[in-house]
Curated annotation (Swiss-Prot):
Segments traversing the membrane: 165-185, 220-240
Domain of life assignment: Eukaryota
Sorted UniProt keywords: Membrane, Transmembrane, Transmembrane helix
Family to which the UniProt record says this protein belongs: Belongs to the castor/pollux (TC 1.A.1.23) family.
Protein name, UniProt field: Putative ion channel POLLUX-like 2
Pfam families per UniProt: Castor_Poll_mid
Keyword Isomerase attributed: no
Topology of this chain in the membrane: Multi-pass membrane protein
GO cellular component entries: chloroplast; chloroplast envelope; plastid; plastid membrane
PROSITE patterns found in the cross-reference section: RCK_N
Subcellular location(s) per record: Membrane
Length: 817
């Protein structure tokens, strides 16, 4: 026999033999000794203030139970070592119990004392009190509301993730398998639970399994499981299909797709500039492939916008048909979130272009600022040029001040370009030429081997290019002194084809000997300068008109058809060209209240030469336009041969929407104005219209040569794209397009030569340099020639031809002897 005794606490007290009759259980005041299945005829009993658990196990057949000698057991117990240890631990146990009692009573005593000592203390009891909850069965309305609440939460989760329904189906399927298995187990006594669960699963996934059941109740259970299995299968199939469709939709939207590209160009926003930017980037990469400087066969472009992905894909597909050297990817996302640019791999991009998508100038600058701020937390953005189109020079300075980014703001001066091109014939063609990569464009290049060379040697030494100035410390100077020496950090600004730049870069051993400069004595230089000064007309120190070197500009009457927010800039630019007594009337269907804010802005600007008036009417209406022109005709008669100019501008909202609609409106208004003027016999000095699609303008001009269509939006788009390819050119174009900086002018050649002369282009350049101008080409017989080669051959120019120069409106005093 085996006996197991478990001791809990020890305070032994031996019982009398008379008390040993209770064999199954011995009880003391608070302790008990339990004996079970005592063998060998029983055991003598004893009592102690402790707890014993004695277990016995019979190992074989023995005689009936008998008593055990309690005295022998007690003597052995008293002599054992554990007994002595327990006796020694009794005082420690007493101390432990007292300390436990103190710890239990101390917090309550402290609370009572504090509550009694502080009259305003909280008198609440820390002991928990029953909450007295109503445990009655809920009403039907409560159950109904609970179910509705559960369905509501389930639907919310389902909207967030369609996979929630899949999880619910799996839970319901497992529940039916368990319930069906338990029912089969109840009615099938001979099968284990595992087989019953498998039978329920078979009925659920295969509807034919329930036909094999034998009893009635089993058939009912199998039938119910088969019906639910069919429902589960149909819902599971539809859920999986919907989940797949949902994932494919997310992939099509591209909002959460991580772009794994490098050396790609990111374009943010969609407006009328986009097709021209894509065209310019396609042309640049085409020439890069020909010159061998391209790193890939096609340039990857990532188009980002908050418009739906389907619309973006349609645009990309339409553009891809015309452009063979760019590959357009689309991504629909927010342009104000850092996560969007991180997923677009902005830190690995070649350049980032941010286009305006709003009509209001303040919204344009605000959105641009938020997009730039979203780029700031991204690491490694210091070397990535970010080209941002803004509408205000103040925003230009603000974006430039953002640290950690290489921001290159491009001010949208479409209104100024429109005025300049309408005042100077062929100026729009010159801009397009300088922005066409297949022709002569602006280039910036450093020549380490020519450090220390004087600017005059550089200006006259390169015979295949037109040297325009220097780029030093991030600022461009079109008029450096001839004695200025080229520094190591300087870059030379010149006009030349792209292939010439590559050819010169290959000449690593290029030295000063490559530059041929005529060596003249000081006396010869003095004589040449005096001879040239006698053949040119000197500029006044301060010119009051951009269109003429005279003190005052011409007096004209202008009819402006259309309205948008940048009319103020147009009026300011017109004021730089026109003389005193000029007038402008604006005809548009925009109310006077909406124009009043612009009128206040006009009042704040110093307009010296133009008097502005407003008329409300639709420029597309024949009668309204006729009345306006007749009123201008009467003013024209009273003004003693004051020239009349009719200009048409596009609404900004049309440009941001469908550009073709803006072109239709502008072309129709201009054709209608020409028809009315012909019927009334009104002589118009200039008929010009703003247009987006230059191809449409060429078609109409072919039919009506007297009309002029100016694609100012296209010019600004090409500037943005060129800055994206070379961010250093931003300073060049900023100075050229700025009203206060150097601009491109088409001036009469009679200012630079006498009748009967045949000077070379180099000679004309020297004469222009005396007027603090940079000659870049000429117009002969209506045909422009920029960067003519060779430059030393005589030119047969007529007095009505023109010279193309870069000049400033108010510069330093022209050079004199």
């Amino acid at each position: 026999m085996m006996v197991a005794v478990q001791l809990f606490t020890w305070k032994p007290l031996v019982l009398l033999p008379s008390q040993s009759s209770r064999l199954d259980r011995f009880a003391s005041f608070n302790r008990s000794l339990s004996l079970k299945s005592l063998p060998l005829g029983g055991i003598g009993s004893f009592r102690c203030p402790g707890t014993f658990k004695v277990k016995s196990q019979r190992t074989g057949d023995t005689e009936p139970s008998s008593s055990v000698n309690l005295n022998d057991f007690s003597s052995i117990l008293h002599k054992s070592l554990p007994y002595k240890v327990v006796i020694g631990c009794i005082p420690l146990y007493a101390v432990f119990r007292i300390a436990q009692k103190i710890c239990q009573e101390l917090p309550r005593l402290v609370q009572n004392s504090v509550g009694a000592g502080l009259p305003f203390a909280c008198a609440s009891n820390s002991l928990p009190t029953p909450l007295k909850l109503d445990v009655s069965f809920p009403s039907f309305q409560d159950i109904r509301w609970g179910l509705a609440r559960f369905l509501y939460l389930f639907n919310i989760q389902l909207e967030k993730n369609i996979g929630t329904f899949l999880v619910a189906l799996m839970i319901a399927c497992v529940s039916f398998v368990i319930i069906g298995g338990l029912l089969f187990f109840k009615f099938r006594k001979d099968l284990p639970l595992e087989d019953c669960l498998w039978e329920a699963w078979a009925c659920l996934i295969s509807s034919s399994t329930h036909l094999k059941q034998k009893t009635r109740i089993e058939r009912v259970i199998g039938f119910v499981l088969a019906i639910w299995g069919i429902l589960f299968y149909s819902r599971l199939l539809s859920t999986m299909t919907e989940q797949f469709r949902y994932n494919m939709t997310k992939l099509r939207e591209g909002a959460q797709m991580q772009v794994l590209e490098a050396d790609h160009i990111i374009i943010c926003g969609i407006n009328s500039h986009l097709p021209f930017i894509l065209k310019q980037l396609n042309s640049y990469h085409e020439h890069a492939v020909r010159l061998g400087t391209a790193t890939a066969r096609k340039q990857r472009l990532l188009l980002m916008s908050d418009t739906p992905r389907k619309q973006m894909d349609k645009l990309a597909e339409a553009y891809s048909k015309d452009f063979n050297h760019i590959d357009i990817l689309t991504k629909s996302c927010s342009l104000n979130l850092t996560k969007s640019f991180e997923r677009a791999a902005a830190s690995m991009a070649r350049a980032i272009i941010i286009l305006p998508t709003k009509g209001d100038r303040y919204e344009v600058d605000t959105d641009a600022f938020l997009s730039v701020l979203a780029l700031q937390p991204i690491q490694k953005m210091e070397s990535i040029p970010t080209i941002v189109e803004v509408s205000s020079p103040n925003t230009y300075d603000l974006l430039k001040s953002i640290s950690g980014l290489k921001v290159e703001p491009v001010e949208n001066v479409t209104s100024k370009l429109f005025v300049q091109c309408s005042r100077q014939k062929d100026l729009i063609k010159i801009y397009r030429h300088l922005l066409n990569y297949s022709k002569n464009v602006f280039n910036l290049c450093s020549f380490p081997n020519l450090v220390g060379t004087k600017y005059r040697q550089l200006r006259l030494g390169f015979q295949e290019v037109v040297v325009c100035g220097l780029l030093r410390d991030g600022k461009v100077n079109f008029h450096p002194n001839d004695n200025e020496e080229l520094m190591e950090t300087d870059k030379l600004l010149f006009i030349a084809p792209l292939n010439w730049k590559k050819k010169q870069l290959l000449y690593t051993d290029m030295k000063l000997e490559n530059i041929t400069v005529p060596t003249d004595t000081r006396k010869q230089v003095f004589e040449k300068k005096r001879s040239r000064l006698s053949k040119i007309i000197m500029r006044p120190r301060k010119s009051l008109s951009k269109g003429s070197d005279s003190v005052k500009g011409p007096t004209e009457s202008i009819l402006l058809l259309g309205w948008r927010g940048d009319v103020v800039q147009m009026i300011e630019e017109f004021d730089n060209y026109l003389g005193p007594g000029s007038s402008m009337e604006i005809l548009s269907d925009v109310s006077l209240e909406d124009r009043r804010r612009v009128g206040d802005s006009i009042g704040s600007v110093k307009i010296k030469n133009i008097q502005v008036s407003h008329k409300v009417g639709n420029p597309l209406n024949y009668d309204t336009l006729k009345q306006t022109i007749m009123r201008m005709k009467s003013k024209y008669r009273k003004g003693k041969n004051i020239p009349l100019t009719i200009l048409v501008i596009s609404d900004r909202d049309w440009l941001l929407g469908d550009p073709s609609r803006a072109d239709k409106q502008s072309a129709y208004s201009l054709l209608l104005a020409e028809s009315i003027c012909n019927k009334l016999g009104v002589k118009v000095h200039n008929l010009a219209s703003e247009i987006v699609d230059s191809k449409l303008g060429k078609q109409i001009t072919g039919l009506k040569p007297s009309l002029t269509f100016i694609a100012a939006e296209e010019v600004m788009s090409l500037v943005t794209a060129q800055v994206a390819e070379n961010s250093e050119l931003n300073e060049v174009w900023k100075d050229i397009l700025d009203a206060d900086g150097d601009e491109i002018y088409v001036k009469d050649v009679e200012l630079y030569m006498k009748e009967g002369e045949n000077p070379s282009f180099t000679e004309l350049s020297e004469r222009a340099w005396l007027r603090r101008e940079v000659a870049i080409g000429y117009i002969k017989g209506g045909k422009k020639m920029i960067n003519p080669v060779p430059k030393n051959e005589p030119l047969s120019l007529e007095m009505d031809d023109s010279l193309i120069v870069i000049s400033e409106l108010e510069g330093d005093q022209p050079i004199t002897l």
